């Protein structure tokens, strides 16, 4: 396992709405301090969904602070319930929180950096921008939002970056032009992006079209976004006769584990590929929401990351191990 989580009880220190739909929550560990953590880290938080204990991952906002873990949660009407639960938390509430972890490796030696954030994807990008500014790096942050009213932390970012912050507000007709953005970068520039799947996929295609090294484009993800609407779907287990329904508010990974199938997982963000399983048939369409597989691999529909990816209709999978308790 890549992450060896240490869990601690945290209390909610404060909450504030940074936009009408995004709430900042500061969590303070009880009885212990906060150790320094890498820029771009996230924490896993224990939540209750319809009375069931589950977990959700949230990126840490801004720089390291000894005062607490700072996260931002978008209220999502079509979410699986995590954001709804987090929005019920008041100062003094207690939750279980993992130690911070990061899959994002940043090369701090580049001469130029392009940061791109889409919507709530600003949460990990904020801290990266602050770290680069401290290093006097050549950095530009492109912030794509529906409107300026929907732009979380806009005042703080403006103060930090000045004219290095470029806001692309959709309602003002200022959509980001990825071809133009990438064409203006020096040859050794690194780009780091976090946003919805459509933005990530578009960036990957335009980056390749610009003949830039794939390793110079790095991602931070949030798994709730997809190319298709979130709906319930069916998973058939090859040669077993079993069919498992995945509700619209549950992940495929959770549904398989609850049905007794042991599916290994790690990041649960669609980044590491540990949970990937084989797909042998598709009766409908797969909505690949990971950034682990390449575009070509996704088009073949031979594997799926069940932690974030979904389907419309039904899929048949194999190579799953049914634990002894479920067999009895």
What are these regions (language model features)?
Residues 124, 261-284, 288, 296-313:
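Local cysteine-cluster metal-coordination motifs and their immediate loop/turn environment
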Residues 171-173, 247, 309-328:
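Short flanking/linker segments adjacent to small metal-binding domains or redox-active Cys/His motifs
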């Amino acid at each position: 396992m890549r992450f060896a989580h240490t869990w601690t009880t945290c209390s909610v220190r404060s909450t504030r709405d940074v936009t009408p739909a995004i709430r900042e929550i500061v969590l303070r560990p009880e009885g212990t301090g906060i150790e320094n953590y890498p820029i771009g880290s996230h924490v896993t938080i224990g939540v209750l969904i319809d009375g069931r204990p589950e977990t959700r991952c949230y990126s840490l906002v801004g720089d390291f602070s000894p005062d607490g873990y700072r996260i931002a949660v978008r209220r999502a009407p079509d979410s699986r319930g995590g954001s709804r639960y987090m929005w019920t938390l008041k100062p003094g509430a207690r939750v279980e929180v993992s130690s911070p972890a990061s899959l994002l490796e940043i090369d701090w030696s580049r001469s130029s950096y392009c940061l791109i954030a889409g919507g709530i994807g600003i949460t990990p990008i904020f801290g990266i921008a602050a770290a680069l500014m401290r290093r006097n790096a050549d950095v530009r942050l492109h912030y794509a939002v529906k409107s300026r009213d929907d732009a979380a932390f806009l005042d703080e970012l403006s103060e930090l970056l000045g004219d290095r912050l470029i806001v692309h507000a959709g309602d003002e007709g200022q959509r980001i032009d990825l071809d133009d953005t990438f064409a203006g970068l020096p040859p050794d520039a690194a780009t780091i992006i976090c946003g919805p799947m459509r933005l990530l996929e578009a960036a990957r295609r335009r980056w390749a079209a610009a003949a830039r090294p794939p390793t110079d484009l790095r991602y931070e993800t949030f798994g709730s976004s997809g190319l298709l609407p979130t709906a319930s779907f069916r998973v058939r287990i090859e040669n077993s006769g079993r069919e498992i329904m995945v509700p619209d508010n549950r992940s495929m990974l959770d549904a398989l584990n609850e049905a007794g199938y042991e599916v290994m997982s790690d990041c649960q963000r669609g980044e590491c590929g540990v949970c990937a399983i084989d797909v042998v048939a598709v009766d409908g369409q797969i909505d690949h929401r990971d950034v682990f597989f390449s575009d070509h691999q996704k088009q073949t529909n031979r594997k799926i990351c069940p932690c974030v990816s979904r389907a419309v209709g039904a899929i048949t999978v194999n190579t799953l191990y049914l634990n002894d308790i479920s067999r009895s």
